[in-house]
C-alpha cells in the first residue's frame, strides 16, 4: 500500500505532509518552500501557473489569476456577493446555479481550480517520496457544510486522489498537538485562516482526540482584514489625489499585495511604510503612493472583524460545558494568529497565554498526515472522535423543524425516526432536509428536498415512513426515506446545499437562544393545532359512522364542540386551542360510551376508538384472557 498524504487545502496557502518512521514530515514544494500559495493563473499563451509563480505575475494579469477559491467552494452564485467584490477575476453563475470562475471565456468550477493546487502538492509529494501517490486526507474548516465538503472531495478526485477522509482543520491541529501527549488535557483550537474561522474544544491524551464542541464563521478570515486595509489605502489616496484606485484592477492587485505585506510587518513592527511608485497616472503625470500605517491605527481599523471571532469561542465553551479556567491549552492555527491583537484577545478570553509550540501554517497538514498514518495502519492506538457542527433534521407538519441529529454529535452517526402522512390517501411525501438550531424549519438552512412516492392509499397517520439520517466520517450526510409497508425507498446525498452567510450562522446557532422564547411559543401553538386537527378528524369520522348509537341531543353537542375546535385552528393561542380540544374530548366521551355499550351486545361489531389509539388484536373474537389471581403475602 502506497503512502497516504495529508493536505491542508487553505484559502491563502496550502501545505502537504506525510508520515515517515512514525513521525509527520512537511514536504517542500518544487521551489523549496514548505507552503504553497493557493493561487492559479492562466497566461495569454494558454499556460497554467500554480503557486508562487502564479502569485508573482498577479499584478500584471489580475483578471486571469485566481486566489481565495476556497471561499467559493460548494457555494451558489447568489451567496457569494461579498466574496465577488474582493476578487479581480470574473465570477459567473453556473448552469446549476453554483458559482463559476470565467477565465478568457471558459468557465471553471471551484473544485477544478482547487484540483490544480492539489495536483501541485501531489506532484511535490511524489517527487519527495519517489513513488506514485493516489490517496490523501484533506482538511476543511469545521464549519464547512455538506456541499463544501463534497466539493473538496470532488477536487481531490479531479486531481487523481482517492480522498480517504475529510477532517476538520481544528481537529487535525489537535491531532498534531496531541500525538505525543500522555496526560489528558482539555484544549481549545483557535483557527483564524485566510478565509474561514473555526474554534473547537477537544479532549486529548493517551491516543484519543475527542471533539467536545465546534463553532465558527465561514465568511471570516484574513482576507477580510486585507480588504479593510485596501479600503483604507484607497480612501486615503482619493483624499490626497482625487483618484479612485478601486476602479483600476492592476492597481488593486498591487494594493492587495501591499496590504498583506503591511499586515504581516505590523505583527513585528510598530509602524510600516506602504510604498507603491507609479500606482497610477493622470493628466499631470504619474502618481506615487506613499503612506505610513501604525500598528495601533491598524488594530483600530480591524477591531470589529477580530471581535467577530469571540462569539463563536464563547458558544463553543458553552456547548462543551467548560469554563476558560478548565481549558489547559489554547492552540493557535492559521497565519493570521501571528497578529499581536488576536493573541491579546485570545489571552483575555481564555485567561492564559496561547500555546506557541506549533507552526500555525503547518500544524493542520501535519495532523492530516497523522490521520493518513492512522488509516494506513502506520500510526497505532490513535482514536479520532469528531462532531457535526450544526443540528440536522426535517420539516414536519406545521413547518416545525424536527431534529434527528443534534449539533456536536460525535460522527459517524446514524439516527432514524418514523413519520406518517398528513392527509388521507396521500400518494407521496416530500422530505425537506434542514440544518440549523431554530424551532421553525423556515428559519434554518434548507440543504435538500426529495420525494418518496407510490405510497398505497390509506387514511392519514397509517403509513409508516422511516426517515434515516446517516453522517459518515467525512461529515457528509445521506438521508433515506422508506415506506415500511412496501419497502419502497428513496435516498439523497446532500450535495446541493451552499455556504452559510455571515448573518445566517448567527441566526442558526448563536441567536437561537435569543429567539428561544418566541420559537417555543410558536412550536407549542403548532403542536396544539396538530393535536386539535387530529382530534377533529377522528371525532368527525367516528360520529359519521356511529351517529345512530347516540341521541340527537348528544350528537348536536359533539357537533357544536367540533365547530368550536375548528374555529380555534386558525388561532395563534395554544391555551385556547387546548381548551377547545379538552371540551371536544369531554363531549365525545358520550359517543365512546354508546359505542362501548353497542359493542358489548351479542353479535355487535367492534367500533374503532375515537382517540386514534390502535385497535385491539382482531385475531380472536375477544381479547379477554382467563386467569387466576393469587394473593401473595410477601413477608420479609
Swiss-Prot record:
Inducing factors: By stress conditions e.g. heat shock.
InterPro entries xref list: ATPase_NBD, Chaperone_DnaK, Heat_shock_70_CS, HSP70_C_sf, HSP70_peptide-bd_sf, Hsp_70_fam
Region of interest: Disordered: 591-636
One Pfam family per UniProt: HSP70
Keyword Chaperone tagged: yes
Compositionally biased residues, Basic and acidic residues: 614-624
Keywords annotated in UniProt: ATP-binding, Chaperone, Nucleotide-binding, Phosphoprotein, Stress response
UniProt modified residues of type Phosphothreonine: 196
MF terms (GO), sorted A to Z: ATP binding; ATP-dependent protein folding chaperone; unfolded protein binding
Function: Acts as a chaperone.
Similarity remark: Belongs to the heat shock protein 70 family.
PANTHER family, A to Z: HEAT SHOCK PROTEIN 70KDA (PTHR19375)
Listed name of the protein: Chaperone protein DnaK
Organism in which the protein naturally occurs: Solibacter usitatus (strain Ellin6076)
Higher taxonomy: Bacteria, Pseudomonadati, Acidobacteriota, Terriglobia, Bryobacterales
Protein's gene: dnaK
Amino acid at each position: 500500500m502506497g503512502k497516504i498524504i495529508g493536505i491542508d487545502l487553505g484559502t491563502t496557502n496550502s501545505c502537504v505532509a506525510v508520515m515517515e518512521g512514525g513521525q509527520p514530515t512537511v514536504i517542500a514544494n518544487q521551489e523549496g518552500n514548505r507552503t504553497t500559495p493557493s493561487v492559479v493563473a492562466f497566461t495569454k499563451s494558454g499556460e497554467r501557473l500554480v503557486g508562487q509563480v502564479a502569485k508573482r505575475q498577479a499584478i500584471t494579469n489580475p483578471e486571469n489569476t485566481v486566489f481565495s477559491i476556497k471561499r467559493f467552494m460548494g457555494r451558489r452564485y447568489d451567496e457569494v456577493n461579498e466574496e465577488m467584490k474582493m476578487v479581480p477575476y470574473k465570477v459567473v453563475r453556473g448552469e446549476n446555479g453554483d458559482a463559476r470562475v470565467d477565465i478568457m471565456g471558459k468557465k471553471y468550477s471551484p473544485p477544478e481550480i482547487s484540483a490544480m493546487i492539489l495536483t501541485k502538492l501531489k506532484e511535490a509529494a511524489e517527487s519527495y517520496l519517489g513513488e506514485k501517490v493516489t490517496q490523501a486526507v484533506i482538511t476543511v474548516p469545521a464549519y464547512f457544510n455538506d456541499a463544501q465538503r463534497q466539493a473538496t472531495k470532488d477536487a481531490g478526485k479531479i486531481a487523481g486522489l482517492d480522498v480517504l477522509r475529510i477532517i476538520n482543520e481544528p481537529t487535525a491541529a489537535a491531532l498534531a498537538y496531541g500525538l505525543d501527549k500522555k496526560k489528558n488535557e482539555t484544549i481549545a483550537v483557535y483557527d483564524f485562516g485566510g478565509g474561514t474561522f473555526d474554534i473547537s474544544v477537544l479532549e486529548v491524551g493517551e491516543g484519543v482526540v475527542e471533539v467536545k464542541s465546534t463553532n465558527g464563521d465561514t465568511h471570516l478570515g484574513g482576507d477580510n482584514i486585507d480588504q479593510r486595509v485596501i479600503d483604507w489605502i484607497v480612501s486615503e489616496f482619493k483624499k490626497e489625489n482625487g483618484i479612485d484606485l478601486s476602479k483600476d484592477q492592476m492597481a488593486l492587485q498591487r494594493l492587495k499585495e501591499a496590504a498583506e505585506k503591511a499586515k504581516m510587518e505590523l505583527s513585528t513592527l510598530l509602524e510600516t511604510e506602504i510604498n507603491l511608485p507609479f500606482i497610477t497616472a493622470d493628466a499631470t503625470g504619474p502618481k506615487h503612493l506613499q503612506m505610513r500605517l501604525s500598528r495601533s491605527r491598524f488594530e483600530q481599523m480591524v477591531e470589529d472583524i477580530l471581535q467577530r471571532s469571540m462569539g463563536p469561542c464563547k458558544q463553543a465553551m458553552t456547548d462543551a460545558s467548560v469554563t476558560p479556567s478548565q481549558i489547559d491549552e489554547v492552540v493557535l492555527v492559521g497565519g493570521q494568529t501571528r497578529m499581536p491583537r488576536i493573541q491579546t484577545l485570545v489571552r483575555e478570553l481564555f485567561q492564559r497565554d496561547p500555546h506557541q509550540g506549533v507552526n500555525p501554517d503547518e500544524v493542520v497538514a501535519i495532523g492530516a498526515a497523522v490521520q493518513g498514518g492512522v488509516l494506513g495502519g502506520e500510526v497505532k492506538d490513535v482514536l479520532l472522535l469528531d462532531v457535526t457542527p450544526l443540528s440536522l433534521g426535517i420539516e414536519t407538519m406545521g413547518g416545525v423543524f424536527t431534529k434527528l441529529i443534534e449539533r456536536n454529535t460525535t460522527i459517524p452517526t446514524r439516527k432514524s425516526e418514523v413519520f406518517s402522512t398528513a392527509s388521507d390517501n396521500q400518494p407521496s411525501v416530500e422530505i425537506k432536509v434542514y440544518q440549523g438550531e431554530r424551532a421553525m424549519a423556515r428559519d434554518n438552512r434548507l440543504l435538500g428536498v426529495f420525494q418518496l412516492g407510490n405510497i398505497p392509499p390509506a387514511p392519514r397517520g397509517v403509513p409508516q415512513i422511516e426517515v434515516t439520517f446517516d453522517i459518515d466520517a467525512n461529515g457528509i450526510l445521506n438521508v433515506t426515506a422508506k415506506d415500511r409497508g412496501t419497502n419502497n425507498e428513496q435516498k439523497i446525498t446532500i450535495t446541493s446545499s451552499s455556504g452559510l452567510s455571515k448573518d445566517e450562522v448567527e441566526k442558526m446557532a448563536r441567536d437561537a437562544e435569543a429567539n428561544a422564547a418566541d420559537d417555543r411559543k410558536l412550536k407549542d401553538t403548532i403542536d396544539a393545532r396538530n393535536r386539535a386537527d387530529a382530534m377533529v378528524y377522528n371525532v368527525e369520522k367516528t360520529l359519521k359512522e356511529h351517529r345512530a348509537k347516540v341521541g340527537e341531543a348528544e350528537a348536536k353537542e359533539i357537533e357544536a364542540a367540533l365547530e368550536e375546535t375548528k374555529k380555534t385552528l386558525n388561532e395563534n393561542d395554544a391555551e385556547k386551542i387546548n381548551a377547545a380540544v379538552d371540551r371536544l374530548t369531554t363531549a365525545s366521551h358520550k359517543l365512546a360510551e354508546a359505542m362501548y355499550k353497542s359493542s358489548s351486545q351479542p353479535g355487535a361489531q367492534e367500533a374503532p376508538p375515537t382517540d386514534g389509539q390502535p385497535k385491539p388484536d382482531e385475531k380472536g373474537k375477544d381479547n379477554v384472557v382467563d386467569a387466576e389471581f393469587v394473593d401473595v403475602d410477601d413477608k420479609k
